[in-house]
């Protein structure tokens, strides 16, 4: 998939953009969901382990799911992936491994470039999480542009920040 194709799909979602990920990818997914929600794209985070305990009901046929996993093999995401495939809910995969389970099951796949984690022993998610966050922020900003989200719209979702910024404009 191309970045533009993913933006097109997300811009036309009739429901919400659901983000999911486990561990460090889950923290990144939460941040991306928060950025999207505060910039005009209805988005929420669903924890993949909680999904199998009833939270799958948070995902509707009008939604699209962005699943984040560096390896693409996060076992806790199996139930949420099975659910969205069963009900033909669009699945966008963000992973470093196109040939992974997630990469193969995604309707659209955005593959992160090859990288080495910045951690001295090369294991702690550092480079991968930074790249994923940058990609998620880029999606949110592209959706802002696509939807014509304005400074005034921003003020509606950020009344305290917006009032403070307006007070300090020259």
Where are these regions (language model features)?
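Glycine-rich phosphate-binding loops that contact phosphosugars or nucleotide phosphates
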Residues: 11, 16-22, 26-134, 140-143
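Long, charge-dense, solvent-exposed interaction surfaces that engage phosphate-rich ligands
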Residues: 134, 138-162
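Charged/polar interaction segments and conserved charged motifs
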Residues: 1-2, 21
């Amino acid at each position: 998939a191309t970045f533009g194709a993913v933006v097109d799909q997300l811009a036309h979602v009739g429901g919400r953009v659901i983000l999911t990920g486990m561990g460090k990818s889950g923290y990144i997914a939460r941040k991306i969901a928060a950025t999207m929600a505060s910039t005009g794209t209805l988005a929420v985070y669903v924890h993949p382990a909680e999904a199998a305990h009833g939270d799958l009901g948070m995902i509707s046929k009008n939604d699209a799911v962005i699943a984040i996993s560096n390896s693409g093999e996060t076992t806790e995401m199996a139930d949420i992936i099975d659910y969205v495939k069963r009900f033909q809910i669009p699945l966008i995969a963000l992973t470093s491994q196109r040939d992974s389970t997630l990469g193969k099951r995604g309707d659209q796949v955005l593959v992160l470039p090859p990288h080495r984690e910045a951690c001295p022993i090369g294991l702690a998610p550092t480079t991968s999480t930074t790249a994923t966050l940058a990609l998620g922020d880029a999606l949110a900003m592209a959706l802002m542009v696509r939807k014509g989200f304005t400074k005034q719209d921003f003020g509606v979702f950020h009344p305290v920040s917006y009032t403070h910024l307006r007070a300090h404009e020259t």
